[in-house]
Amino acid sequence: MIKEYRTINEVVGPLMIVEKVAGVKYEELIEVRMQNGEIRQGQVLEINGDKAMVQIFEGTSNINIRDSKVRFLGHPLELGVSPDMMGRVFDGLGRLKDNGPELLPEKKLDINGEVINPVARDYPDEFIQTGISAIDHLNTLVRGQKLPVFSASGLPHKELAAQIARQANVLNSEEEFAVVFAAIGITFEEAEYFMEDFRQTGAIDRSVLFMNLANDPAIERIATPRMALTAAEYLAYEKGMHVLVIMTDMTNYCEALREISAARREVPGRRGYPGYLYTNLATLYERAGRIRGSKGSVTQIPILTMPEEDKTHPIPDLTGYITEGQIILSRELYKSGIQPPIDVLPSLSRLKDKGTGEGKTRGDHAATMNQLFSAYAQGKQAKELAVILGESALSDVDKIYAAFAQRFEEEYVNQGFDTNRSIEETLDLGWELLSMLPRTELKRIKEDMLDQYLTEGK
């Protein structure tokens, strides 16, 4: 039931206090009708007795308390969903912004989603190919997983996000795959880059885009990832598709949370972020997964920039607790011209062993992954030793490992943002690099596998 009030008591920043309300619900959608006919939308943030605190999406500037009316609409923020969403571009509140025809929704869904019973969850165990060797082979992405990318200011996470959105796929061609892309608090130039890339490569045909710009209100940034995840859940659980949700930049989302928390005069937690930051992030990340009896799945790649490149900052720290690993971008590799600059040693996919092996990727996947990790770590150590003591101090085997590490970065990790490698190409490249090492050094691979795959004469 719609209720209308003229009892606005106070306006503070983006917040408004409405008095003498009854039957109002948390997160209920509201409309503010101004004297000049303008209508602004908002959402109930807090209820205390007969007072409601609401946040206005478009801001509170020029709102006259005496002449404005507030309507409580009786339902939370919703997204109209339909199979026709594919190929369309929405703003952060789910309104079309691509100048295309209006969308006729099949239904409207609450953007906060429904709680998934843990018992109903199915274990993630199917491979998703991104076409990026450092991810597919060494930090494998599995359907239903949440695998964040930890970047820093100035690093090419924008290009990496576009590459994953463009190239990601499932190996079974009979299964439908879709990408839901949520851009949170990005600049106009970044939005243009993503739109242009999606359109030029044709990736937009299998994608749903939500674009929230830096000059949009903070409350819209809070809604954007929820809009994207609602669209993803609809496509996955009602249309049977495997959906990859890419959200960039989650740091902007957390900054918006901090801004709203400060406006509400809440007691701040670590570095000024609200004490419920962990819980709030969990309401997003835990919407990834698979459900028993459902054909589809929701996989997440949240991308965030670490403030001051600090892994202990609350945003990457709490994200790491909730998610199943992390892909870390390295400034050192970026300066060396390695693209994408994925630092494979501190990166981790906790579910990688569940999505690899015969019938999923290839039988030699796990063994070559372990051997490459080991050899690269030894090669890095040898290179560091050479810097301190000089190359002459290295043994012959150490020199081979140092050369291996160099080639590994330049040929394996460095593939550019336009190269789409199949998992077979990646595994074959891994064997080519391992053939540099003496056979006696390949201790993590079984003899029969060495006989089958190792290049002759090496």
Curated annotation (Swiss-Prot):
Keyword Nuclease attached: no
A GO biological-process term: proton motive force-driven plasma membrane ATP synthesis
Keyword Ion transport: yes
Pfam families attached to this UniProt entry: ATP-synt_ab, ATP-synt_ab_N, ATP-synt_VA_C
Keyword annotations of the record: ATP synthesis, Hydrogen ion transport, Ion transport, Transport
A Gene Ontology molecular function term of the record: proton-transporting ATP synthase activity, rotational mechanism
PANTHER family: V-TYPE PROTON ATPASE SUBUNIT B (PTHR43389:SF4)
Annotated function: Produces ATP from ADP in the presence of a proton gradient across the membrane. The V-type beta chain is a regulatory subunit.
Family assignment from sequence similarity: Belongs to the ATPase alpha/beta chains family.
Name recorded for this polypeptide: V-type ATP synthase beta chain
Organism, as annotated: Enterococcus faecalis (strain ATCC 700802 / V583)
